[in-house]
């Protein structure tokens, strides 16, 4: 394990986080929950004039439900308004349990119970587990007939307004081995790519080109997918080689040159040595690389070898004798367990994405504290 080096004081500006937001931005929250994952995405305003949220994993109780309450109090989402028959209002458009390890679903039962009037859909990979957290989670889902329940695999796409969620893993090949336990539970993970604004057919010109491709941004949420699963992803989502054919130009116009490129990467498996490889990070080529882990971690995360390969993918030094990597923060690598030099924790982070730009905010919370939006500080680098 290599604990993150404290970030120099003075690298964050105290500003009004809520006032800085505009309705057309996507906001990704990565919560400081120690060894685990809890994530929330605030979507851009939809044609009906409302903002919805997506929740991906809930490691602990309290933190994510409290964040939902804070977003409502700040006027960023509306109050729950279920239908007369108990149908949810869909303001929580989707909840994802990426896989059934407790450090990803330990707070899921509480969340499903508290936010029942809001939740429209629920996804998990369909990997049966015997832990009480998993059984409690599934009991909550099965007791709510109004929630749409799905077990998607690689290639599945779902639009939420202007945001497109693509499932990268598990592959169908891995999914078909679940029932025999021929797939390790981490490799059952639902890893996701979220793109916005994602163009549909009417968002193209006469030549089928995206009207404003430069404004499109993506983030990849790696869950706990390991190298076996990523090997399937690298095959299922190929990089386009140079080709001047009309078909190739049409594909490039629609998707870009790489189906795995992303502005933001939430590193899989807490930056373990099994969670990422060099080719994967080079393919994604993120401007921001985020890691959810504790300090100290009970599992020894992040692993040194994973940190080094991420740094090498972002700043190649292997062929230059004597060259050393820049500090992680200068490479856009941030950890939920980051601290400030001579100060306290930097804590949970939000990445505000829009108009081709991504801005990082920190909230200074510990693992046991809720996120206070008024404490937001913007990373200035």
Q: How does the language model describe each region?
A:
Residues 35-39, 66-67, 106, 246-251, ...:
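Alpha-helical scaffolding within the catalytic cores
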Residues 34, 59-61, 101, 128, ...:
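Catalytic metal-binding/acid-base residues of hydrolase active sites
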Residues 58-69, 176-180, 236-246, 269-273, ...:
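Acidic/histidine-rich helix-loop elements
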Residues 40, 53-55, 191, 218-220, ...:
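Short hydrophobic-acidic sequence motifs that mark active-site Asp/Glu residues
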């Amino acid at each position: 394990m290599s604990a993150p080096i404290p970030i120099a004081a003075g690298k964050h500006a105290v500003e009004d986080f809520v006032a800085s937001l505009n309705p057309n931005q996507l906001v990704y929250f990565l919560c400081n929950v120690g060894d685990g994952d809890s994530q929330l995405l605030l979507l851009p305003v939809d044609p009906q004039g409302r903002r919805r949220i997506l929740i991906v994993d809930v490691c602990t109780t309290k933190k994510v439900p409290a964040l939902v309450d804070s977003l409502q109090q700040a006027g960023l989402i509306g109050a729950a308004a279920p239908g007369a028959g108990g149908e949810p209002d869909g303001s929580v458009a989707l909840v994802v349990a990426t896989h059934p390890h407790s450090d990803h679903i330990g707070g899921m039962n509480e969340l499903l119970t508290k936010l029942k009037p809001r939740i429209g859909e629920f996804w998990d990979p369909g990997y049966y587990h015997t832990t009480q957290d998993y059984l409690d989670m599934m009991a909550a889902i099965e007791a709510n007939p109004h929630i749409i329940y799905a077990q998607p695999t690689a290639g599945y796409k779902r639009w939420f307004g202007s945001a497109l969620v693509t499932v990268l893993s598990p592959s169908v090949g891995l999914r078909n081995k679940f029932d025999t336990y021929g797939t390790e539970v981490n490799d059952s993970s639902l890893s996701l790519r979220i793109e916005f604004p994602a163009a549909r057919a009417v968002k193209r010109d006469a030549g089928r080109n995206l009207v404003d491709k430069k404004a499109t941004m993506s983030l990849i949420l790696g869950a706990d997918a390991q190298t076996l699963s990523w090997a399937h992803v690298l095959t299922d989502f190929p990089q386009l080689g140079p080709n001047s054919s009309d078909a190739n130009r049409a594909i490039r116009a629609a998707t870009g040159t790489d189906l795995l490129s992303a502005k933001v990467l939430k590193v899989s498996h807490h930056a373990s040595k099994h969670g990422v490889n060099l080719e994967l990070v080079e393919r994604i080529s993120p401007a921001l690389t985020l890691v959810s882990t504790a300090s100290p971690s009970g599992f020894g995360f992040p692993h040194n070898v994973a940190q080094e390969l991420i740094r090498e993918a972002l700043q190649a030094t292997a062929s230059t004798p004597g060259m050393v990597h820049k500090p992680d923060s200068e490479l856009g690598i941030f950890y939920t367990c980051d601290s400030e030099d001579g100060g306290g924790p930097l804590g949970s982070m939000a990445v505000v994405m829009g108009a081709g730009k991504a801005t990082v905010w920190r909230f200074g919370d510990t693992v046991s504290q809720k996120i206070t939006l008024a404490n937001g500080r913007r990373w200035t680098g």
